[in-house]
Amino acid sequence: MNKKLLSEFGDPVQRVKNALQSLKRGNGILVLDDENRENEGDMIFAAENMTVNQMALAIRFGSGIVCICLTKEKCKILNLPMMVKKNNSKYKTAFTVSIESAYGITTGVSAYDRIITIKTAIKDNAKPDDLNRPGHVFPLQAHPGGILSRAGHTEAAVDLTKLAGLKPAGVICEVMNDDGSMARMPEIINFSKKYNMPVLIIKDIIEYYNFIN
């Protein structure tokens, strides 16, 4: 990672604090993972306060695959089985079956419809019957041990929203360049300046846990 590029956002602890404040205010953040892993940057929003305009931004500048990151307990409550019985993907990304709200939407594709689906899924009293399967929102089940057990964007989204005092559920979407390639750190930082989103890396969250503990 180019630490010089990140330095304008503060040290690791400050970068996490900035991210938590942004999530509390209802704004998005940008999280990069290790360059030896996916080496990609994701937009992350807190599921409970994400807006239609923010969803439109994620769809327009992201991969189009919008995921909601949930705890294992929430996935169990919603009866969301894993997408496949044997996960042989490179990073064992824990996709469940895709979902759609059972009410209040049309085709489920629009930014508005996807927000309705997300709000439906994270309701405190949400039931399995509140969601249709398959759909256009892709749940990801976070590792129960969080970022300290699996250093992925899924765990970052759940851990950061929890640390921010919000429901432990985040919406993520990978950022892409105009030519269809994946955005790396230089492009992510340019994107952050344009849309006023703080930047941090996965390792910052691990350092933050060490700091507060």
UniProtKB/Swiss-Prot annotation:
Tell me which residues bind Mg(2+) 1.
E38
User: How is the cofactor bound here?
Assistant: Binds 2 divalent metal cations per subunit. Magnesium or manganese.
The cofactors named for this UniProt entry are: Mg(2+); Mn(2+)
Enzyme class comes to lyase
Classification via InterPro entries: DHBP_synth_RibB-like_a/b_dom, DHBP_synthase_RibB
- Sites marked Essential for catalytic activity: H136, E174
Q: Which Pfam families match?
A: DHBP_synthase
User: Mind naming one GO cellular-component term on file for this protein?
Assistant: cytosol
Positions that bind Mg(2+) 2: E38, H153
Write down the chemical reaction(s) this protein catalyses.
D-ribulose 5-phosphate = (2S)-2-hydroxy-3-oxobutyl phosphate + formate + H(+)
Record's keyword terms, sorted: Lyase, Magnesium, Manganese, Metal-binding, Riboflavin biosynthesis
What is the E.C. number?
Answer: 4.1.99.12
Report the pathway entry.
Cofactor biosynthesis; riboflavin biosynthesis; 2-hydroxy-3-oxobutyl phosphate from D-ribulose 5-phosphate: step 1/1
- Which sites bind D-ribulose 5-phosphate? R37, E38, D42, R150, A151, G152, H153, T154, E174
Q: What does this protein do?
A: Catalyzes the conversion of D-ribulose 5-phosphate to formate and 3,4-dihydroxy-2-butanone 4-phosphate.
* NCBIfam families per record: ribB (TIGR00506)
Q: Which family does it belong to?
A: Belongs to the DHBP synthase family.
Quaternary structure note: Homodimer.
Q: How is this protein named in the record?
A: 3,4-dihydroxy-2-butanone 4-phosphate synthase
